[in-house]
From Swiss-Prot:
It comes from Geobacter metallireducens (strain ATCC 53774 / DSM 7210 / GS-15). It comes from the Bacteria. It is found in: Cytoplasm. Specifically methylates guanosine-37 in various tRNAs. One of its GO terms (cellular component) is cytosol. This is tRNA (guanine-N(1)-)-methyltransferase. Keywords: Cytoplasm, Methyltransferase, S-adenosyl-L-methionine, Transferase, tRNA processing.
């Protein structure tokens, strides 16, 4: 999978994109990430990439010309790449969006900055916009990193265990169950006995119920779209009845 990132601050990506799973994916040839400095495509001698907004107002707006020139240079090599914009106006980037994006071969992400970007970038080039949450960031770079990290987990061969992406939190609409490893006891806190029993059916049942408990406690809104069977619904009813007593 190929990512091209259009940004004013390419150095921000050096740590997150050169460590851990992403680094190994790049080394194995499963992932290709290229950074493009938008400022390099400004044509004036001062390399200006922003200007005051028409109509007045606070902040500065990223100019359309440098972004267009940078994007067109990338598209000359990646004509089929899907063009995305990180923006608070975009749809929420979630696990389903990450899975969807992983089906693409080539993706271009434009990182917004300052007060925003000239609207003509959207009108002329952008195919989709994503937000990672209802909060303000200094720029779209952090959002782009989050999107890449979440997406590459669904690229075949990236994770060590093929099933990891399918059992992670949100994979079936629920928060994930608690995890434990050695030692079996630490400062009076023991690993649940069922996890040491060797009974795979009981372990699976415990994990499913804990996932339901975590979800109803922290993110009950997720249950509206979660994939639930009759046992799940019965257990949720028990939890609700217990909470009302």
């Amino acid at each position: 999978m190929k990512f091209d990132i259009l940004t004013l601050f390419p150095a921000m990506f050096e740590g997150p994109l050169t460590e851990s799973i992403i680094r190994r994916a790049v080394e194995k040839g499963l992932l290709d990430i290229r950074l493009h400095q938008i400022r390099d495509f400004a044509t004036d001698r001062h390399k200006v990439v922003d200007d005051a907004p028409y109509g007045g107002g606070d902040g500065m707006v990223m100019k359309v010309e440098p972004i267009a020139a940078c994007l067109e240079a990338v598209k000359a090599e990646r004509p089929k790449a899907r063009v995305l914009l990180t923006s608070p106006r975009g749809r929420l980037f979630d696990n389903a969006a990450a899975r969807e994006l992983a089906q693409e071969q080539e993706v271009i992400i434009i990182c917004g900055r300052y007060e925003g970007i000239d609207e003509r970038v959207r009108e002329l080039f952008v195919e989709d916009e994503f937000s990672i949450g209802d909060f303000v960031l200094t720029g779209g770079e952090l959002a782009a990193m989050v999107m890449i990290d979440a997406t590459v987990r669904f690229v075949p061969g990236v994770l060590g265990s093929p099933g990891s992406a399918e059992t992670d939190t949100f994979s079936d609409g629920l928060l994930e169950y608690p995890h434990y490893t050695r030692p079996a006891e630490f400062r009076g806190h023991s690993v649940p006995a069922v996890l040491l029993s060797g009974n795979h059916a009981e372990v699976a049942r415990w994990r499913r119920r804990k996932a339901l408990e975590e979800t109803i406690r922290s993110r009950p809104d997720l249950l509206e779209k979660a994939v639930l069977d009759s046992d799940d619904r019965r257990y949720l009813l028990e939890l609700e009845e217990g909470a009302s007593k």
